[in-house]
Regions:
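C-terminal target-recognition/interaction regions appended to catalytic cores
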Residues: 240-241
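Conserved small/polar residues in nucleotide/adenosyl-binding loops
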Residues: 245-247
């Protein structure tokens, strides 16, 4: 691990970290290190990486999150519009009428209570939700299934899609269960709000006092993000009004 490493980035690991790398990362974090982890929902069997996250009270769930609340997704139930929670890392976007878009995301669970039953040091780590689903969300374990309907082996929510973890030694970590957020077309769909979310997370990790906030946008027309519920309601109203006009 370089001595001048300000923030360690693990971006959509396709294979597991080694045991030696696991030890190095743990030492780095115990010395006040900062880490940003993006998880690819399609990749499982990351035993050492998941072990690291679980030791920080964050448990990645198998599969891809499916949202049942039509106000929390757009186009498809796996195109999530998660709730932006109140936190130091999200203060610029919280309650600011902003959507972030997280397609094909992996759910995260706060397992602080579970870990505390086995290890009293679990309380040294504080998990804060940054992005969350509705209570009706579930994780589709079989990602090759022909249906998005909830099946017996699927995992019930709610889930966090992104969390921040701080520890008593000064270490900080953000774990986000989506690698697609910064794809250009996905980010543009929410007028750069995904980039703002990530940059504010970096700002939080770096413990900068000045907020990155919401970056200035160009004069181009911004995309209007419409949750699926609103899309359906608009369609119903349009059909109803047009029907009345036709009848009259």
């Amino acid at each position: 691990m370089p001595d001048d490493c300000s923030i360690l980035l693990i971006n959509g690991a396709q294979k597991d970290i080694t045991k030696d790398e696991l030890k190095m990362i743990k030492t780095y974090m115990k010395n006040g290190g900062k880490m940003y982890v993006f998880l690819d929902a399609r990749v499982e069997n990351l035993t050492n990486l998941y072990s690291l996250l679980q030791s920080y009270n964050v448990e990645p769930q198998k599969g891809v999150v499916v949202e049942s609340d039509a106000s929390k997704y757009t186009q498809y139930p796996i195109y999530l519009l998660p709730t932006i929670e109140s936190s130091d890392a999200t203060s610029a976007q919280y309650n600011n009428n902003v959507y972030v878009l997280a397609p094909s995301a992996k759910g995260l669970k706060d397992i602080t209570e579970k870990n505390a039953k086995k290890d009293s040091s679990a309380s040294d780590y504080t998990v804060t939700s940054l992005l969350s689903t509705s209570d009706g969300a579930y994780s589709k374990v079989d990602t090759s299934s022909s249906t998005l309907n909830k099946e017996k082996k699927d995992i019930s929510g709610p889930f966090d899609i992104s969390v921040a973890v701080s520890d008593s030694s000064g270490g900080r970590m953000i774990v986000t269960g989506c690698t697609n957020m910064l794809l250009q077309d996905i980010d543009q769909a929410v007028s750069g709000a995904n980039t703002d979310f990530v940059l504010n997370g970096v700002n939080y990790l770096a413990e900068q006092k000045s907020k990155i906030s919401i970056r200035a946008k160009s004069l181009k027309t911004e995309n209007a993000v419409v949750p699926a519920f609103n899309q359906k309601a608009t369609l119903i109203m349009t059909v109803f009004v047009l029907s009345l006009i036709h009848i009259s």
